[in-house]
Amino acid sequence: MAGGVLPLRGLRALCRVLLFLSQFCILSGGEQSQALAQSIKDPGPTRTFTVVPRAAESTEIPPYVMKCPSNGLCSRLPADCIDCTTNFSCTYGKPVTFDCAVKPSVTCVDQDFKSQKNFIINMTCRFCWQLPETDYECTNSTSCMTVSCPRQRYPANCTVRDHVHCLGNRTFPKMLYCNWTGGYKWSTALALSITLGGFGADRFYLGQWREGLGKLFSFGGLGIWTLIDVLLIGVGYVGPADGSLYI
């Protein structure tokens, strides 16, 4: 009986050991899998790399470069292409020389076709607003009356031409006489006044419809108004209603 109990106890002890080992393996495997899952879920701090863009290279072309001929004579460059050291102590109307340098991005040559940056220009001592009218361009006005006594003036903004050199500001205001045309011809107005003046055709042509209606319904003022208009249009006293000049 005792011999049968001992093997039974040994078997139970062996089963307990195997059960303990199996539970230990299960627990240890679960912890490892949980740790692995946690590591996958939370990978920890990550490194971020910031890409610093390269500084954009300036490729803009200055607007004045479009006016500057490439590899031309430096002395013939437009005024917008050069910087000159000027002074206002020169004598008006006398020749004077100034030291000049080309602006950035401008290339020019001397008389020997060698690249040049600094040079001398010759000009007449006078301010830009003292130039002849052929050396600058001014804005035109179509809102003033050209046929008036005394003649009307209007404020204009004038700009010196590119190839002309002068002292002071190259853009300046100036009062100019009204001098614009609306497309009316003096010969046409005179011909209408002679042939169809009794019906007011000359006045209608010039845009003076009120006077035209008066001549039409009065048959040219019985001829008197027609003769007067022929004289007034002939000497240029009667002009277009918009205040412009004849062509």
UniProtKB/Swiss-Prot annotation:
Tissue expression notes: Widely expressed.
Signal sequence coordinates: 1-29
Cited InterPro entries: TM2, TM2D1-3-like
TM spans (from-to): 180-200, 216-236
Location of this chain's protein in the cell: Membrane
Membrane topology qualifier: Multi-pass membrane protein
UniProt keyword list: Alzheimer disease, Amyloidosis, Glycoprotein, Membrane, Neurodegeneration, Signal, Transmembrane, Transmembrane helix
Keyword Transmembrane tagged: yes
GO terms under biological process: lateral inhibition; positive regulation of Notch signaling pathway
Extracellular side stretches: 30-179, 237-247
Cytoplasmic side: 201-215
Coiled coil: none
GO cellular component, one term: plasma membrane
Any Pfam family: TM2
Protein family: Belongs to the TM2 family.
Name this protein carries in UniProt: TM2 domain-containing protein 3
Organism listed in the record: Homo sapiens
Gene: TM2D3
